[in-house]
Amino acid sequence: MQNMMNTSQSFQNDSVLIGDKNTLQSINKSVDNGSKNTHGITGIMNLGNTCYMNSALQALSHNYLLINYLFMNKKQIIRTLLTNARKIFKDCDNFKIESTISPIPLELRKKIQSENYHLSMLTVEDVNILLNNTITAQIIRLFECMWKNNCVVVPTSFRKVFGEVRDKFFFGYEQHDAEEAYSCIIQKMQEELAEKRTIRFKTTRHSVGEYIKYMNDVKEKVSCLPNGKEKDIVMNKFKQIKKQMPRESLTAESFREMKKYYEQGYSYITEIFSGYVHSSICCPNTSCGFTNDRFDAFTHLSLSIPVKNMYEQLNVYDCLREYFSQETLDADNLWNCEGCHEKVQAIKKTKLWTTPYVLVIQFKRFGMTRIAKDNRFINYPMDELDVSSVICSQQFEDSVQTKYKLQCVINHHGGLNNGHYFTYSKIENTGEWYEFNDTYTGKVTDNHIVNQNAYILFYIRSDLFRSQ
């Protein structure tokens, strides 16, 4: 361990260029096992109502952007997990010094709780214990086994760690939701691999760069001026420029908000699965015109299913339009405008701002009350999903990509209380679709993929998708 400490490089202060094509190209490859046989056709044993977990694992294990990142960066990932060990485990019951029933050795618990914690304090045994208690290391180990041989794996170790997260939300043998499993796995990997980095964004618009430079110059100038007339003159001029360059101003604001989000804890998991939505609320008073802009990250879109005539066919675009439709804030939901300080009837608009590498779409078949399941058929494209119709009209960066190809479908068969989850996944290096249904695996034809049981769709951006 000491030898690893001496030879490894620290990455804590590296800067990251979000959306860097060079990084993408390095992992944008098929999983290669040195064999001409198709690999990754592995079943997962159901350990007692764990089909929800198995289906999420199969979807993630056949996401080649994720798989290649995990496999090709294993050493750095392990180092990050060990570096972050105190942050990951210091609030975990098993790692508390006062615990009387913890399976973790007392000496290791003391190291984790120490404010002076460092990798050099760890023994080989410590390293193994720590890694065995992380979702990320367990999922790498599981996926390596799944891709090494076409077999059936029994995910006992992963299940044990997975059952401990979210205050043991998944503990026991109750049925849960596949979306909850997916979200939990991604969130835990983000947390475990989070690093402080300096984040940069590259604009494709010269005017945006000029605006950001001007804005920074104004901030520097204002910071040196005393409160008074001269400062007011500078700020009033800036406000005029801002009004004249609304798109540049909004883009600069988005960079600022996204920078904060990524710098709170950067990981490549976040970059793969995260996109941004832009919400705006505008005051209707012509004398005011104040607009509140907000940018929010997402790792999946949870889409309501519109109410339609029973004879009208639904498609994923109907659901996207419903999700991104404008909302009137009236009656008991009046908006308190920060500009005129009045409660007004305003319009809230929400649109996509940036698109993730992997777009995950959930159909809300169970609703808020979970009284019944909506079994209606929803059509969705396999070869090209184009989300350009729900991109914010103020977004004018050329780098925003809007077309996707389907990679995976998590299906839910049956009713609300007696359903079963299984997965259709595309094997990226052959283009063939397979069904993964707990221990069962088998080829399926394309006409099976778009089906009434579809619950969660996984799309990969077309500009990242390898041609067959």
UniProtKB/Swiss-Prot annotation:
* GO molecular function terms attached to this record: cysteine-type deubiquitinase activity
Q: Which InterPro entries does the UniProt record give?
A: Papain-like_cys_pep_sf (IPR038765), Peptidase_C19_UCH (IPR001394), Ub_carboxyl-term_hydrolase (IPR050185), USP_CS (IPR018200), USP_dom (IPR028889)
UniProt domain USP: residue ranges: 42-462
Q: Could you name the active-site residues?
A: 51, 420
Annotated S-S bridges? none
Q: Which SUPFAM superfamilies match?
A: Cysteine proteinases (SSF54001)
Reported EC number(s) for this entry are 3.4.19.12
Task: Give the UniProt record's GO annotations in the biological process aspect.
Answer: protein deubiquitination; proteolysis
Arranged from A to Z, the UniProt key words for this protein are:
Hydrolase, Protease, Thiol protease, Ubl conjugation pathway
Query: TM segments?
Result: none
Catalytically driven reaction(s): Thiol-dependent hydrolysis of ester, thioester, amide, peptide and isopeptide bonds formed by the C-terminal Gly of ubiquitin (a 76-residue protein attached to proteins as an intracellular targeting signal)
Q: Which Pfam families match?
A: UCH
**Family per UniProt?**
Belongs to the peptidase C19 family.
Instruction: List the protein's name.
Output: Probable ubiquitin carboxyl-terminal hydrolase R319
User: Which organism is this entry from?
Assistant: Acanthamoeba polyphaga mimivirus
